[in-house]
């Protein structure tokens, strides 16, 4: 388990990295800024594991892993997991938590494009959760994910749709009213319509397999997966 540094390439938003660096120490605080990620992680994990036909014994890459919430949970399922992130502090938190938990995860500080140049076609599963809306060129990330997965392997994306409802729910509601995430976490201009993401996927070797929405009910304070991709959504693709 290590956290290696590497040269920064063009597809990095330093302001976005700084946001997460500032709160990295609270990544594993179940009642802190990352509480929503902890709450939705079981849903993400079950969706990924089910759609990929299980994770045990598979080589998995988590792109934009942050403090390692999803990466650790996939490792617990028996996967060999590598976590990528450009934030040094989140990776240090992830490394320490994995050590404390007795979980083996290889954490690397580099962009997915850099990783793809060295590890093309090496992964059974690639996950990229809530990361595309935080980089200058999300299409480049999609291309790199396609390069990294083996033939027949699975790639999963999750992001936010760009429309009035997603602005109300993810920005006004989540940041200012419910205060579920820190103010300034999201920029609606960077949200990605499903048609845009699918268009980028179509320009790679990936093929769409399934898409689902991730929904929050403020009355019951619960999350669920289901039809409707007007706010948060997850996309399962497979390498042809």
Curated annotation (Swiss-Prot):
GO terms for molecular function: 2-polyprenyl-6-hydroxyphenol methylase activity; 3-demethylubiquinol 3-O-methyltransferase activity; polyprenyldihydroxybenzoate methyltransferase activity. Its EC number is 2.1.1.222, 2.1.1.64. S-adenosyl-L-methionine binds at residues 44, 64, 85, 129. InterPro entries: SAM-dependent_MTases_sf (IPR029063), UbiG_MeTrfase (IPR010233). It catalyses: a 3-demethylubiquinol + S-adenosyl-L-methionine = a ubiquinol + S-adenosyl-L-homocysteine + H(+); a 3-(all-trans-polyprenyl)benzene-1,2-diol + S-adenosyl-L-methionine = a 2-methoxy-6-(all-trans-polyprenyl)phenol + S-adenosyl-L-homocysteine + H(+). Keywords: Methyltransferase, S-adenosyl-L-methionine, Transferase, Ubiquinone biosynthesis. Pathway: Cofactor biosynthesis; ubiquinone biosynthesis. It comes from the Bacteria. It holds the Pfam family Methyltransf_23. It is an enzyme of class 2 (transferase). GO terms for biological process: methylation. O-methyltransferase that catalyzes the 2 O-methylation steps in the ubiquinone biosynthetic pathway. HAMAP family: UbiG (MF_00472). PANTHER family: METHYLTRANSFERASE, UBIQUINONE BIOSYNTHESIS O-METHYLTRANSFERASE, MITOCHONDRIAL. Belongs to the methyltransferase superfamily. UbiG/COQ3 family. This is Ubiquinone biosynthesis O-methyltransferase. The lineage of its organism: Bacteria, Pseudomonadati, Pseudomonadota, Gammaproteobacteria, Enterobacterales. The gene is ubiG.
């Amino acid at each position: 388990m290590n956290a290696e540094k590497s040269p920064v390439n063009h597809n990095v938003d330093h302001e976005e990295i700084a946001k997460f660096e500032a709160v990295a120490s609270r990544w594993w605080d179940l009642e802190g800024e990352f509480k929503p990620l902890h709450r939705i992680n079981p849903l993400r994990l079950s969706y990924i594991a089910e759609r990929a036909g299980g994770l045990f014994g598979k080589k998995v890459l988590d792109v934009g892993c942050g403090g390692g919430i999803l990466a650790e949970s996939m490792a617990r399922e028996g996967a060999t997991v590598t976590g990528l992130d450009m934030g040094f502090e989140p990776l240090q938190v992830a490394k320490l938590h994995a050590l404390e938990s007795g979980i083996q995860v290889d954490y690397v500080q580099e962009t997915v494009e850099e990783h793809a140049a060295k590890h093309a076609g090496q992964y059974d599963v690639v996950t990229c959760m809530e990361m595309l809306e935080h980089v200058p060129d999300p299409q480049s990330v999609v291309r790199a994910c396609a390069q990294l997965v083996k033939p027949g392997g699975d790639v999963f994306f999750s992001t936010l749709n760009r429309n009035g409802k997603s602005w109300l729910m993810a920005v006004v509601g989540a940041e200012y009213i419910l205060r579920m995430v820190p103010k300034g976490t999201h920029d609606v201009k960077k949200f990605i319509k499903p048609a845009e993401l699918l268009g980028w996927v179509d320009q790679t070797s990936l093929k769409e397999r399934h898409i689902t929405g991730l929904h929050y009910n403020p009355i019951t304070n619960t999350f669920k997966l289901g039809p409707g991709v007007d706010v948060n959504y997850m996309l399962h693709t497979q390498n042809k």
